[in-house]
């Protein structure tokens, strides 16, 4: 039976480090306030002129190098982002161009913080049915250019960072290696709990002076509701994956959760009963890079030796929509 193996990982973050103290120049906040509520010490923001496609290409090159695979062997690109470089076309085609590729499909997905797992689910299905052999899966975000750097937007602005992460997925016949299963869900009744209202194609014009004055072009969130659902849905969907494969939480060697908030990750860890050495968090250094958090964290965990061949990797995410998902991978 054909399975999907993760054969290479890579990531790229901007060189501009933005500390909590720097944010105090823009809004009423403090390093202590941010750390206590989010666990974040600093995040990376792009410099002017940096594109999502450019960061995605850097992460992709690292992942391809790690896999020992030339870019020309990639059969398809799946790219997850909620902050595309342009309204259209999708960022995936710009990544394709950056890598010097031609004619292969480039699919953009918008599933917010769950985007990488949605992308993994799609890519895994393509590989299992034999449609493609080698797929480049990327999560990339530039959030810093779209946040409200004032006290009004403080709850959101302190969270977000920029970056890209990539994984090279390849078909394998190894019976003990690869993606065991993916599990994805959505619940649109909560769509306005975490969202960005403008610009919007149903508006004429898509964005106007009133939208700008009222900050509708900035992301908005009911933090309490998001927290409540995140700490419930992520352990639940991990349990779904474990049950589907006849496994228990004790079988997990490494959990890489979406890096939304350190308090959320810690709550998920407690509910699953995992020790500190079986979870990987890096939100302290990068903030929430939405669709890029999982591949960035995975790439770092691999380079730190946190995964051994045959180990059980669990990925889980929760995000705007609401969307959420999980995956189990035998490394």
Residue ranges and their predicted role:
Residues 1-48, 151-228, 232, 236, ...:
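Condensing-enzyme catalytic core mediating Claisen C-C bond formation in acyl metabolism
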Residues 6-8, 34, 63, 74-77, ...:
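Buried hydrophobic positions in well-ordered alpha/beta secondary-structure cores of metabolic enzymes
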Residues 7-10, 80, 110, 135-141, ...:
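Short beta-strand segments
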Residues 27-36, 86-100, 137-146, 206-211, ...:
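Acidic-glycine-rich active-site phosphate/pyrophosphate-binding loop
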Residues 53, 57-60, 64, 83-84, ...:
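Claisen-condensing/thiolase-fold acyl-transfer catalytic domains that form or cleave C-C bonds
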Residues 66, 70-102:
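Anion-binding (especially nucleotide phosphate/pyrophosphate-binding) glycine-rich loop
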Residues 72-80, 249-258:
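Short glycine-rich phosphate-binding loop at a beta-alpha junction
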Residues 128-164:
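Flexible, glycine-rich active-site loops centered on histidine and acidic residues
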């Amino acid at each position: 039976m054909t399975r999907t193996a993760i054969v290479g990982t890579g990531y790229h973050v901007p060189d501009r480090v933005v500390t909590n103290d720097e944010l105090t120049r823009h809004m009423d906040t403090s390093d202590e306030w941010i750390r206590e509520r989010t666990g974040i010490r600093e995040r990376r923001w792009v410099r002017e002129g940096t594109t999502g496609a450019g960061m995605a290409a850097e992460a992709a090159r690292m992942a391809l190098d790690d896999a020992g695979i030339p870019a020309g062997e990639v059969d398809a690109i799946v790219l997850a982002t909620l902050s595309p470089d342009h309204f259209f076309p999708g960022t995936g085609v710009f990544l394709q161009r950056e890598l010097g590729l031609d004619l292969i499909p480039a699919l953009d997905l918008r599933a917010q913080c769950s985007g990488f797992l949605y992308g993994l689910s799609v890519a895994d299905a393509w590989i299992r049915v034999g449609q493609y052999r080698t797929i480049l899966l990327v999560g990339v975000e530039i959030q810093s250019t779209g946040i409200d750097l004032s006290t009004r937007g403080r709850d959101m602005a302190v969270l977000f960072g920029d970056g890209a992460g990539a994984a090279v997925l390849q078909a394998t016949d190894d019976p003990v290696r690869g993606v065991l299963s993916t599990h994805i869900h959505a619940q649109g009744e909560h769509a306005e709990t975490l969202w960005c209202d403008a610009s919007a194609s149903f508006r004429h014009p898509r964005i106007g002076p009133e939208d700008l004055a009222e900050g509708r072009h900035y992301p908005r969130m009911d933090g309490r509701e998001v927290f409540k659902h995140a700490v419930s849905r992520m352990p639940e969907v991990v349990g779904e994956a474990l049950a589907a494969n006849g496994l228990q939480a004790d079988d997990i060697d490494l959990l890489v959760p979406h890096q939304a908030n350190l308090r959320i990750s810690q709550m998920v860890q407690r509910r699953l009963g995992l020790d500190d050495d079986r979870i990987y968090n890096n939100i302290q250094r990068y903030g929430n890079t939405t669709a890029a958090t999982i591949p960035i964290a995975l790439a770092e965990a691999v380079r730190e030796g946190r995964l051994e061949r045959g180990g059980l990797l669990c990925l889980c995410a929760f995000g705007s929509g609401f969307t959420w998902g999980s995956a189990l991978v035998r490394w």
